[in-house]
């Protein structure tokens, strides 16, 4: 691909980036407001859980949120700059030492808790 094409793609991608995305990372508890279309109507659905993975790739950035629903673990991956996401709110900062928290999949109850970052 030529340099000109790369510059054009870069400019288009930068225009698509959302500017209202808060700083969050693995271990943080977030509330993601997702636009859900049901027939003619559109509503917002809140999805609250712990961020277990984050992928930073500009426009292609994504993060995975895990929550326990009816005693069953549910994970959902969101594209950070997707138009389907209305807002992201950080509810609690988690203090973790890993970038990917996949080990939480094997744990439940008290062992799946994450310490809160105090600063």
UniProtKB/Swiss-Prot annotation:
Belongs to the bacterial ribosomal protein bL19 family. It holds the Pfam family Ribosomal_L19. The keyword Ribosomal protein applies. GO terms for biological process: translation. GO terms for molecular function: structural constituent of ribosome. Keywords: Ribonucleoprotein, Ribosomal protein. One of its GO terms (cellular component) is cytosolic large ribosomal subunit. It comes from the Bacteria. Gene3D superfamilies: 2.30.30.790. This protein is located at the 30S-50S ribosomal subunit interface and may play a role in the structure and function of the aminoacyl-tRNA binding site. Disulfide bonds: none annotated. This is Large ribosomal subunit protein bL19. InterPro entries: Ribosomal_bL19, Ribosomal_bL19_CS, Ribosomal_bL19_sf, Translation_prot_SH3-like_sf. It comes from Pseudoalteromonas atlantica (strain T6c / ATCC BAA-1087). SUPFAM superfamilies: Translation proteins SH3-like domain (SSF50104).
């Amino acid at each position: 691909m030529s340099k000109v094409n790369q510059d054009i793609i870069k400019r288009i991608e930068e225009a698509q980036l959302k500017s209202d995305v808060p700083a969050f990372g693995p271990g943080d508890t977030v509330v993601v407001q997702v636009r859900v279309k049901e027939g003619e109507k559109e509503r917002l659905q809140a999805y609250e859980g712990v961020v277990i993975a984050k992928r930073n790739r500009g426009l292609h950035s994504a993060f995975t949120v895990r929550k326990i629903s009816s005693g069953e673990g549910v994970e959902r991956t969101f594209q950070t700059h997707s138009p389907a996401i209305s807002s992201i709110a950080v509810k609690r900062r988690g203090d973790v030492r890993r970038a990917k928290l996949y080990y939480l999949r094997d744990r439940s109850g008290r062992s799946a808790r994450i310490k809160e970052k105090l600063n």
